């Protein structure tokens, strides 16, 4: 191991459900990030790419391993990546996908080559299923490298990653903690497809039975909710750390001048409740709404003919910041177990209150009545009632906007997050 631990301590401490770690100032370390996508695509990619940038800035050595794509922005010295698997536009090669998504010998072989050349002190896994498969965990274990994994969703507990039935959209925990994932097949939980659900169930059952996740030294949970779910399964007990996600942009110093609109920004998908949001918009013809984002239900938003709804497409950077900062409040009405949604944090950091469903890890991020309002009934009519009341109460909105700005100093920053992450790395390596 090239990791050198000094005796200089900093006062950063955090607690998980099982133990307390103290941050130790570290000499330069070698970290290998593993994720199926190596370009900015979603929350998981933003997470590890930002961390990688910050660790590099601090003088640590960072390399990456994942799937080949022309859009990749990071990689490793050997320029190794697995063959691209495009489930939506694949040709005849997709006939081999059912075998490759269960166990990728290619990913395992190439990762071992990268490990051999880079000699990392620690491997940090993120999203690996399907395109890389947990075979990469076996590669790390066989090379004797300490490993941590950030748990971005409930995939380790549920084959469809959402704990929500595909057809009924009801929350479901039928597979949680069980070796057999047969309920996934019975309910056709993956895209409503029997073959896909069967493959997902086989994958989940395979990795439950061969205990591959036992090889991970520590699991980072972005919400107390997700940590609690993991701890219902004995193999995760004593291995979890809860760290809320960080803000990657600078928080606002004061509330911006507000426009006259309510905003939804983020992924346009059913689990995010975008269809129900549009139904609520229909019930509120006098309230202007703006929708920004992309995703599976993008056409529904593009083709929306409601005069009070404006779809502005995918936004990023300064344009998105201005849009969020200028909104009266933002909507976060997911119907699935959200983990630690960055959009919710970003809205509050820019001085914009939030209206959220009380589900998953969302309540942990909202000071009810101060930075946002929580909703308990997930119907368009209930949404409309909450939106109407909040839209009409401009003094409350102004007060909550001020509280959001005050809260920014208590939010997790990238710098603070990396301090705590390095402490965790040091603890894992010392005890490996």
Language-model segments: what does each one mean?
Residues 142, 155, 170-218:
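Membrane-proximal helix-turn-helix segments that form the acceptor-binding/catalytic region
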Residues 220, 247, 254-272, 278-284, ...:
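Conserved donor-binding/catalytic core segment of Leloir-type glycosyltransferases
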Residues 225, 246:
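Carbohydrate-associated surface elements
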Residues 299-322:
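Nucleotide-activated donor-binding/catalytic signature segment of Leloir-type glycosyltransferases, i.e.
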Residues 325-339, 352:
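Acidic donor-binding loop of glycosyltransferase active sites
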Residues 344, 359-369, 373-375:
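Short acidic/histidine- and often glycine-rich active-site loop of Leloir-type glycosyltransferases
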Residues 368-369, 373-380, 389-394:
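Conserved acidic donor-binding segment of nucleotide-sugar-dependent glycosyltransferases
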Residues 382, 389, 396-411, 417-423:
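A short, well-ordered alpha-helix in the C-terminal region of glycosyltransferases
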């Amino acid at each position: 191991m090239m990791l050198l631990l000094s005796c200089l301590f900093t006062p950063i401490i955090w607690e998980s459900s099982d133990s307390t770690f103290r941050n130790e100032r570290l000499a330069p370390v070698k970290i290998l990030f593993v994720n199926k996508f190596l370009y900015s695509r979603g929350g998981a990619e933003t997470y590890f790419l930002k961390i990688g940038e910050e660790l590099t800035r601090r003088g640590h050595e960072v390399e990456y391993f994942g799937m080949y794509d022309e859009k990749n922005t990071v990689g490793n010295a050997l320029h190794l990546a697995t063959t691209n698997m495009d489930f939506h536009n694949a040709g005849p090669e997709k006939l081999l996908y059912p075998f490759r998504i269960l166990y990728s010998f290619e990913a395992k072989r190439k990762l071992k080559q990268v490990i051999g050349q880079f000699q990392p002190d620690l491997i940090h896994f993120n999203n690996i299923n399907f395109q890389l498969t947990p075979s990469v965990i076996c590669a790390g274990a066989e090379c004797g490298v300490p490993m941590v994994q950030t748990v971005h969703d409930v995939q380790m507990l549920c084959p469809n990653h959402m704990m929500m039935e595909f057809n009924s959209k009801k929350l479901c925990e039928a597979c949680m903690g069980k070796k057999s994932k047969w309920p996934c097949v019975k309910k056709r939980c993956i895209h409503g497809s029997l073959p896909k659900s069967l493959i997902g169930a086989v994958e989940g059952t395979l990795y439950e039975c061969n205990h591959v996740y036992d090889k991970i030294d520590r699991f980072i949970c972005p919400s107390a909710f997700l940590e609690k779910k993991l701890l219902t399964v004995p193999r995760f007990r004593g291995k979890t750390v809860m760290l809320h996600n960080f803000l990657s942009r600078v928080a606002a110093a004061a509330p911006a001048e507000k426009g006259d609109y309510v905003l939804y920004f983020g992924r346009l998908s059913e689990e995010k409740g975008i269809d129900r949001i549009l139904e609520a918009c229909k019930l509120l013809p006098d309230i202007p709404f703006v929708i920004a984002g992309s995703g599976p239900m993008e056409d529904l938003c593009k083709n929306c003919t409601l005069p009070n709804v404006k779809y502005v497409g995918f936004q990023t950077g300064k344009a998105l910041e201005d849009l969020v900062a200028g909104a009266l409040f933002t909507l976060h009405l997911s119907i699935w177990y959200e983990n630690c949604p960055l959009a919710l944090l970003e809205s509050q950091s820019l001085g914009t209150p939030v209206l959220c469903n009380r589900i998953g890890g969302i309540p942990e991020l909202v000071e009810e009545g101060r930075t946002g309002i929580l909703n308990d009934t997930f119907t368009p009519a209930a949404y409309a009632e909450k939106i109407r009341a909040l839209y009409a109460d401009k003094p409350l909105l102004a007060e909550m906007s001020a509280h959001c700005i005050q809260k920014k100093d208590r939010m997790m920053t990238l710098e603070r997050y990396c301090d705590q992450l390095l402490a965790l790395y040091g603890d894992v390596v010392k005890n490996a």
